[in-house]
Amino acid sequence: MRSRLAVIFRQSFRPHIITTGITTGLVTGYLFSKYKSTVHANTHANVIIGERMPSLPIYSMSEVAKHTTKESGYWLAYKDGVYDVSSFVENHPGGKQILKTAGKALESCWKIFTIHQIDHVYETLEQYRIGNLPKGEREANEKHQETVLDLFQYDPERVNANETFFIRSQRPFNAETKPNLLVSSFLTSVENFYVRNHMHVPVVNINEFKLEIRNEKSSRSLSYDDLVDKYKSHTITSAVQCAGNRRAAMNNEHQGAALGTQWYVGAIGNARWTGVKLRDLLESFGLDKEGEHVQFWGLDCDTSQRCYGASIPMEKALSEDVLLAYEMNGELLSSDHGYPLRVIVPGTIGARSVKWVNRIIVSDKEADSHWQMSDYKILPPSIKEPQQADFDRVPALQESNVQSAICSPSSDEDGNKIKVLSVKPSDKDKRLTVKGYALGGGGRAIQNVQISLDHGKTWFQAELEQLAQPHMRAWSWTLWTYHINASDIPSKPFDIVCRAMDTHGNTQPDTPLGIWNVRGVMNNAWHKITLQIDDSFLKKAKELK
C-alpha cells in the first residue's frame, strides 16, 4: 500500500456543521441578477435596499418560514425586509430554483457568494417587498451569517496566489493561470493549475472516506485503499478546460453581457492523471450493461445535502480513458483539485470532471443538479436572459470544441483589461516570439495552428509541440510557437490573431458574434491581442540603419 500518512494527518479532522442554503443562494442570486420584474408587489423608489420602511407591516421570521408553498406563497427575508417572490417563481422559467430558499433569510447565501452584491440584484429583489422584520430579527440573521462564513475556514492556504493567478472570486475560490505561466511547461504544475470551485473545499477524513457506487436496485461502497490497491492504475495526459474559458471576450454592446465568471484565456491546464478506469469499476460491479447515464456527485455540499453533481452518457463512461483519478502529475491530488478522488472525463468540458467525488450512480436519467440541468448549456442567441430559456429543451454540454489562444507575450496585468501591450523583440535574434496553446476537444488532435498579422488575409504556420496520441484519444493540449522577424513588425500598434484546426477539419470562427450565448460558454473564436513595439527598440533599430 502506498504511503498516505502525511495526507491522513493533514486531513484527519472534520469541520463543525454549519446550517446554510449555500447552493440555493448561488442559484437564487443568479436568477435575480438579470431579471427585471414587470409583475411585482410594491415598488418603493429612493429607498436603501432592505432597510426598514415604517409604512409596511411587520412579519416575523417564524411567519416568513410558513410561506414555502404555492398555496401560502414564497417569502424571503433580507436585512429588515420581507419579500413575496411568488409571482417571480410562478411566471418565469427557472424561478422554481428559489423554492429551495423560500422561508429563509438571504444574507448567509449572498454574503458568501459576493458576486450577488450588486445594485441590480438588490433593486430587483426590492420590487417584491411586502413588509419588515421585527426589531432584533435582522441582528439575529446577521449573527447567524457570521457563523456561516466559517464554512470557508478549511479552504487550503493559497500562498502567493496573486503571483500565479488572476483571481476571479475568493468565495468560492475561482482563479485562472496567468498566460505566461500556462506556456512555461508542457505539463501544468499543480501550483499553476487553474481552480474552479462551485462551493467551499470539503475536508475529508481519509480513514472514513467511502466511494458509493449504486443503481436503482443496489448500492455498494469502497474505501479509498480498496480502490487504489485492488484496481489496476491507468495514466493519461489530458487537458481540463472550463466551458466558460474566454467568456469575457463574448461581451459586446450589440448582443450584451455573457453571464458568469469573466475568464480570460487561463481557465485551462494540462496534466498527467493517474487513477482507476471508470469502466473497470463499473464492470467489477456488473453495472456496465444498464443505464443510459453515469452520475457523479461530490462532497462539496450544503447542509441540506444539495451537492455539486454532473453526468455523462454511459457510452462515454465505458470508453478507454475516463478515470477516477487520485494522482495529478505523480502526486496525490491537492485539496483544490479534488482530494482524495476526482473524475477526469477527457475531451469533455471541465464541469463533468467532478471533484471530491464520493457517489457514482448508474441511471436512465441525467444528474438532476443545477449545473447539469440549468447551466453549462448553449442557449440560443435570441435568449438575452437565462430566465427566458426552457433549459429542458437544451442538451447539456459534453465535448469541448477546437480552441487556441495566445499566451506570450503577455503581462501580469489582467488580460481582460489590456488594450495594447508593449513588447520588445529579442536583442539576440531580432525576433518577437509568440506562444500559445491549442486543444482539439472530443479526442480530436490538432493538425495545425496558424497566425495572422493582417486580420486573417494571410496566415503563417506555427511550430507545434504535441504528444503522439492514439486516434480519437488526443486528450492533451498542443503548445505552439511562432517567430516574427523584427523587420516585419510595424512601428504602430498591430494585431496578432491565432486559429487552430483539428484533424477533422474543424476550425475556429473569426469572431464571437456568431456563437454568442448569454452564458458565455464554448467561446472559441480567433484569439486576438494588440501589440505595440517598445519605443526604445524602435529607436535603437532606427539608429542602426
What is the role of each PLM region?
Residues R2-N174, S238:
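Histidine-anchored, small-residue-rich loop motif
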Residues V82, A105, H116, N245-A249, ...:
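Solvent-exposed loop/turn segments at secondary-structure junctions
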Residues G136-E212, E216-L222, D229-Y231, A271, ...:
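Extended, aromatic/histidine-rich regions of cofactor-dependent oxidoreductases associated
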Residues T235-A267:
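Short, conserved helix/loop micro-motifs enriched in His/Cys and acidic residues
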Residues V265-K277, G286:
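Mid-length scaffold segments of soluble, non-membrane domains
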